[in-house]
């Protein structure tokens, strides 16, 4: 079975598509004052949030990297997330660089450009993921 034929996968894509549509619509409706409003993330305004979250779309729109050769047992998503969020894990060690990148992106792009990532790239990525084979 192709990944794109898995009902759970398709439901998750539906949810992702709806989420990106909301980000797109909300971003398109924000005023300049709202874009520069502080968020709950220290030091980040709304533009930084859009810059950060839209990085996922940029990553998915790029050609996939060559699959690495792996050995050993595969890890579950739970194991990966536990390690990622553990003290000293990537979530904490990479946080300063991630925050800096979001702030840079937010200053380098107009708010409309950040929202457009969800409007323009989102549907293209979702279409590709819906038709992707297991190795696409």
Describe the role of every protein-language-model region.
Residues 22-45, 63-71, 128-136:
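Helix-loop segments that flank and shape redox-cofactor active sites
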């Amino acid at each position: 079975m192709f990944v794109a034929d898995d009902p759970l996968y398709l439901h998750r894509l539906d949810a992702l598509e709806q989420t990106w549509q909301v980000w797109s619509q909300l971003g398109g409706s924000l005023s300049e004052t709202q874009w520069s409003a502080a968020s709950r993330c220290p030091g980040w305004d709304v533009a930084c949030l859009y810059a950060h979250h839209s990085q996922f779309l940029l990553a998915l729109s790029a050609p996939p990297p060559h699959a690495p050769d792996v050995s050993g047992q595969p890890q579950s998503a739970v194991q990966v997330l536990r390690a990622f969020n553990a003290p000293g894990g990537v979530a904490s060690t990479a946080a300063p660089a991630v925050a800096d990148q979001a702030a840079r992106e937010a200053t380098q792009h107009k708010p409309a450009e950040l929202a457009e990532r969800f409007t323009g790239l989102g549907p293209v990525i979702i279409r590709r993921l819906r038709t992707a084979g297991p190795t696409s």
